[in-house]
Amino acid sequence: MELLFLALLIFIMAVALGSGYPVAFALPGAAIITVLLAAASGYLLASDVSAYFHTGGPYEWISAGVLNLRGVYWEVERDTLIAIPLFIFMGIMLQKSKIAEELLITMAKLFGPVPGGLGISVVFVGALLAATTGIVGATVVAMGLISLPAMLRNNYSPSLATGTIAASGTLGQIIPPSIVLIILADQLASAADQAGAMRKALHKQVTGEISMPSVFDVTSTSAGEMFLGALVPGILLVLIYMAYILGYSLLFPKNAPAVENDEGFNKAFYMKVAITLVPPLALIILVLGSIIAGIATVNQAGAIGAVGATVMAGYKTIPENSGRYTPAIIVVASLIILGVAISNFDMNIKAASSAEDFLGIYIGLFGTAGLLVGIGWSFVRVLKVDDILNDVMLETSKTTALVFIILLGAAMLTSAFRAFGGEEIVKEFLSSLPGGFWAQFAIVMLVIFILGFFLDFIEIAVVVVPIVAPILLADPSANITAVWLGVMIGLNIQTSFLTPPFGFALFYLRGVAPAVVKTIQMYRGVVAFITLQLIALVIVGLYPPLVNYLPNRSSLLSEAAPPPRNPRLQFCLDQFVTDAIAADQGATMAAINAAKTISVDDMPKFIGKSIEGSTESAEEALAALAGIQIAADAVQDAEAGYRPQLTLVRGLEKQIRNIAEHRDKLAKQASRMNADNPERAEIEAEVAHMSDEIAALESQIPDNWEAAHDTFKKLTDAESKARNSYRRSGDTAWNDAAIILATLDATPAFIALESDLNALRPVLETAEFEVAEDAAKALERSFRDLEGADDVKKALGKVKKAMSKRKKDRETALKEYEKALAAYADQLVWRAAAETQVRPGVQVYLNAIKGNIGARSQEDLTREQALFLASCTSHHKDLSLNF
């Protein structure tokens, strides 16, 4: 019955919306009516008002609906909704002051005779507005107020115009900074933790190993990564829109005519372009940049946009005169003064102590006063000229009320959807779905698409994502990243906001569109853009580097980049080294052979052994590197026959685990019942049936499975062994040679200790034992910190021991001191000789292996390595063969 009322909920809502009933009342009305019908049916048919609810009853769910409704405007976590009226104010102010229209028209003129130029400029401006708001409602409303009148005046097809505006407005879902991306990042971070635990449990079940290698962990995400990941898909979507409008205008020129540029492309025109185009774009860039740089929150950026729009309106709404730009000039000059003060002075008034500190504060106060004067002057202007400020405030209030009442209705609808088990149905269905990751992923995308018909994007992010994301992220066969999943969900949510008849973007636009534009024209206009969004969704889905590359690049090139030894980088770093060795045309091998010829005559034994050990390890590393490819090819050859068996067996085992879990719950439930309870017998019979079902599934596992699994595991173990062997040899090759160079680099410090060493003799001869012991100890510590000075350090250690309280043997101490002097003299000789005899060859050798087999031993990645790894790690690597 819950399913019946869930279907009834959707049906009532569809009928109400289809009949033209206001959306603000259709959404909560459908929820309340369905809940009351379910309660009445339960009372009449089952004598229980809660009978036809998934959990709870009508009282609980109506209360939950009220709480959801209150949460739209009261929850601290949803303070970003405050930005909606601010950005609406900005858009309406731009429209009233004609700045936005001039911006769109000027950009269209720049395209000249290109058909569809105004539509293309609308997409571009829409993308910029989306980048400032990140909120669908505010962006769609702002674009509807700014763009639609201009397009209709230029004889654009109402369908193309409304479709372009609705699609451009929803770019706020995917173009950063976006509120939905921040929410998704938070939810996906938690989901990644759950998925990591699920993957570890799966690894333990199928392999029997207690711990899972860290390279198999689920990749989490952050808001910053989500912004970077969504940037390229957002730009891709904008380019697809522009290409479509251009193609459409070429096929149907009457529906998207070119905007004539009667002024011509002369110096005066370009000056007008600069005056018209630069200030609004600078405002948009300022709003977006303040968010990305972390200077302002979304709400603060909205305030910046509202004030900036007012300042520009202050000089646009009055006729040409000598003082037209005065308020704007004061604002810009004040900002420059504040920037200079902040950059050159400590502006903390509590910490100010010097005249210079107070000078900076006075400059800042002067700049602030100027800023307030300029802003206030602009507000007075727009208040006095045609009563623009009053009109803007009134329109902002009306539009804000429209947007928020839709959000309130969506909150009530969400409560009803939960009441009838919509969430649980989705979760259980997804968990039991066969067909592997991509079947599950397709279903999830479809579910999110459908839920987007009647759920706010925030509700989808906080309700649906926690349910489905852990299941998708935990699957080792796809091994997707959380940032890719988040961007895909963001693109999907954006698509669903355009879907007739329930797309919220359409309702937002309908609220501001003139009556001449029919609703059916809006529906017809968005169909093409829905198709374009689905194409973009498929492109991003098929090519994950579009999402993953920028976050990886940013991470690997940052100051906090992971070191080359990071386990997650090893597979791709091995590939980088393989390619580098293949491309160097034997230069590395030649460097190894040259290192073997370095003369170590009259050098201490450790130098010769280090060079010999390093070159041998380097040759072993090269051989192991070739062995990796052989082992990997063997795994790949065997994979074709092993993977179908693996997929079959893991699928059967998954079914067995699910049935066994359900069976154990029923068995536990039966054990708590009385023996004479008739339900116990039914449950026990069901438990027995499930046991038979498990046995039947186990019988389907091929008899040769264990042998096939063991054989394939030997191949994967051989590949792992080859990789580990290469890495050990490469590390040894670098470290052994690097010790020699570190020893020679310590020579200046070694020479600097000669005076201290000579000064120790009189101390040993005449000073108190305790004083002499401390002096020897300090000098020993100094030599201990130098590479290659062990023989001197050991002799000084014996000196210290002889002068200790227990020994107090001055004669022995002086003998050991003479040995230290002799060792020091010997070192001076061979260190001087090594500077010309050993250092050049070792330095050339280390330079030759630094970027390949010695890469793991470096402190940081080179730019070339980081870029390669960013590209390599952007692809999703199938890990299912290890599970």
Predicted regions, residues:
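Alpha-helical transmembrane segments of multi-pass membrane transport proteins
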Residues: 1-883
